[in-house]
Amino acid sequence: MAKPALELRRGLIKVRIWRRRSKQGPRYSLSVVRLFRNGDHWTESTRLGRDDIPLVRLVLDEAYEWMLTNGGEWE
């Protein structure tokens, strides 16, 4: 499996930034997940609760700044 260009984590929120090469240069996309425990195992979910929103906003701002700094376009 491909590795993300960058992974940011704040609390239980994780954002992965994926880089893809194109003729116009690098292009980025991202995924957002929330970690939770299912018994003894940590699992990821794309469902977010109301109280997750402030952390998601913070990490998305950091991801956006990283993408701007590292060039490239959004997918």
Cite the ranges covered by each PLM segment.
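Single-stranded nucleic acid-binding surfaces, predominantly the OB-fold ssDNA-binding core
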Residues: 1-75
